[in-house]
Amino acid sequence: MDQDAFILKEDSEVEREAPGGRESLSDVIGFLDAVLSSEPTDIGGDRSWLHNTINTPQGPGSAHRAKSEGEGEVSTPSTQDNRSGEESRVSGRTSKPEAEAHAGNLDKQNIHRAFGGRTGTNSVSQDLGDGGDSGILENPPNERGYPRSGIEDENREMAAHPDKRGEDQAEGLPEEVRGGTSLPDEGEGGASNNGRSMEPGSSHSARVTGVLVIPSPELEEAVLRRNKRRPTNSGSKPLTPATVPGTRSPPLNRYNSTGSPPGKPPSTQDEHINSGDTPAVRVKDRKPPIGTRSVSDCPANGRPIHPGLESDSTKKGHRREHIIYERDGYIVDESWCNPVCSRIRIIPRRELCVCKTCPKVCKLCRDDIQCMRPDPFCREIFRS
């Protein structure tokens, strides 16, 4: 009997709570429809209605329960507790849209602060428009009730009055970087401010533009004198006759040995050697190529002496030429005399005198018994 009574009481309690649950569900659905139908771009609008509590009628809050053991226990939850629970659920559902709206307001405020602190009057007028509706209200409400900072108010004032910055510059007042600390004095270096260098945030600063001045002609001349290039050494200096050891430079009032005064024909080598007016100039020897030797006129001990390449070839006479080759397993050395004035060829052969002053036969030619390569020149020498 007690169990049947308990079941009947529970059914009646469920029937009482069901209408209240349906009413709260319909209120939540209506609230969601209102949120979804609102304009998403209306960020700065009045949303004070979001903080209003939703009052829903509730049924009788007292319920009596009985246990099978016979002990009765009365539970009387108040209507205020039910309302607080429903308000917490509703606030939990609405916290996400409210947080998104507040984050959007903060982003707009940060953008407005950045435009007011880092751009000049021209960029502010372009970004905020010509005083029309740019999407940001002049004084958007603060949902959380936090006090606004002085920097934000100052930025709003500068955005509303863009001509104030130009007046400050015309009066020569020091300009501060919006949203940051003031610029250091001129005496301080860029390494101050606790190791952080401060750059000017505005391109219209009078302190920055005061550095870019037109230089005076005196400054330009000083810079040109300082930056004038020094004469660079293109290389080692050429050796002059005065610096060459063992030589003597001619006096300035004399003519060189190779030149001749005007009005005179060019002199020959013999005149230079015999003349006493010109300085003594050593004539470089003409060196024959390797493989040939010059011959002196004075043999020693009855044998011909073949001097080296340093012999003087200007003396008239003969030179001894040799050719060495192999024949039938033997090394053959052929030698003959040629006039000094004749050409020296790669393939040695007998040459005729060109200057017509060289002797036909010298002492070395007389010692030749036979001519290994007879030719008309050899026959003429031996006939004579």
UniProtKB/Swiss-Prot annotation:
Q: What Pfam family is a match, any one?
A: zf-Paramyx-P
Chief site of localization: host cell
A GO biological-process term: symbiont-mediated suppression of host cytoplasmic pattern recognition receptor signaling pathway via inhibition of MDA-5 activity
Report the protein's function. Answer: Plays an essential role in the inhibition of host immune response. Prevents the establishment of cellular antiviral state by blocking interferon-alpha/beta (IFN-alpha/beta) production and signaling pathway. Interacts with host IFIH1/MDA5 and DHX58/LGP2 to inhibit the transduction pathway involved in the activation of IFN-beta promoter, thus protecting the virus against cell antiviral state. Also interacts with and inhibits host IRF3. Blocks the type I interferon signaling pathway by disrupting the RIG-I signaling pathway.
Q: Where is the composition biased (Basic and acidic residues)?
A: 7-20, 83-101, 150-168
For the region Disordered, give the residue spans. Answer: 1-23, 38-318
Keyword Zinc on this protein? yes
Protein name, UniProt field: Protein V
Sites of Phosphoserine modification? S68, S125, S192, S249, S257, S260
List the GO molecular function terms: metal ion binding
Residue spans with biased composition (Polar residues)?
50-59, 191-206
Report one GO cellular component. Answer: host cell cytoplasm
Summarize subunit and interaction data from the UniProt record for this chain: Interacts with host IFIH1/MDA5 and DHX58/LGP2. Interacts with host IRF3. Interacts with host RIGI regulatory protein (via CARDs domain) and host TRIM25 (via SPRY domain); these interactions prevent TRIM25-mediated ubiquitination of RIG-I and disrupts downstream RIG-I signaling.
**Other observations noted:** The P/V/C gene has two overlapping open reading frames. One encodes the P/V/W proteins and the other the C/Y proteins.
Enumerate the residues binding Zn(2+) 2. C341, C353, C355, C358
